[in-house]
Each structure stands twice: as structure tokens, then as C-alpha cells.
Amino acid sequence: MAAKPGELMGICSSYQAVMPHFVCLADEFPQPVRPAKLPKGRGRLRRPRQSRFKTQPVTFDEIQEVEEEGVSPMEEEKAKKSFLQSLECLRRSTQSLSLQREQLSSCKLRNSLDSSDSDSAL
């Protein structure tokens, strides 16, 4: 007997119910529950759209004032010294890491050569 098209998809066409062998899929992948929508007018109050776009105008003179304030030469020198010190520290740490990597790779190479020599001695 040929199966009905609805039964091929896992639905009993006479009852419109999920067939038992497809029930496990419903348990594994439950459908997400959507939150109930609030009726219009009872949601949170929104600010008027115009208030979001209001900003204080900035003039060219104000921008120049900020640039002119600047940092004292002593603070600038201190910051530069700190920056160069951190660069040097970073360089040393990367250099030591590369040396460790080279030592590790040479050690692995030496061990692999030693093991091949011992095999040939047998």
C-alpha cells in the first residue's frame, strides 16, 4: 500500500498529528516561545525623536583652545620615555620567545635524529 503524501512528511493526514517516530525531533528542537506583545500605547514611553539629535554646536575657536592646552614638555618627555621602555620590553620578550622556539625545534630535530640512529643499529 502506498503512503499518503502527508504521512511521508511525518503527519497522519486523518488526525493531523505528529507520528510517534517524529516526536523525538520535537523534544530535541523545541520551538522558541515568543514573548507576548504589549498592546499599543501601553509600552514604554519613547522620547520625542527630535531630542535624540540635539547636540551642542562646536566652533573652530573651541577646537583650537583644546589643542593649545596641550601637555607640559616634562610630561611629554616622561610619556615618551615610558613608551620607549615598553617597546624595549616587548622586543626583549619576543626575542626570548623566538630563542626558546629555536632551542625547542633544534632539540626535537636532535631527538628525531637520535631515534633514527638507534633503529639503524638494530
Curated annotation (Swiss-Prot):
InterPro entries (UniProt xref): DUF4695 (IPR031521)
Pfam families according to UniProt: DUF4695 (PF15766)
Main location: cytoplasm
Residues recorded with modification Phosphothreonine: T55
Presence of keyword Phosphoprotein: yes
Keyword terms: Cytoplasm, Phosphoprotein
Entry keyword Transcription regulation: no
Entry's localization field: Cytoplasm
Modified residues (Phosphoserine): S72, S86, S96, S112, S118
Name of this chain's protein: Uncharacterized protein C11orf96
Taxonomic source organism: Homo sapiens
Phylogenetic lineage: Eukaryota, Metazoa, Chordata, Craniata, Vertebrata
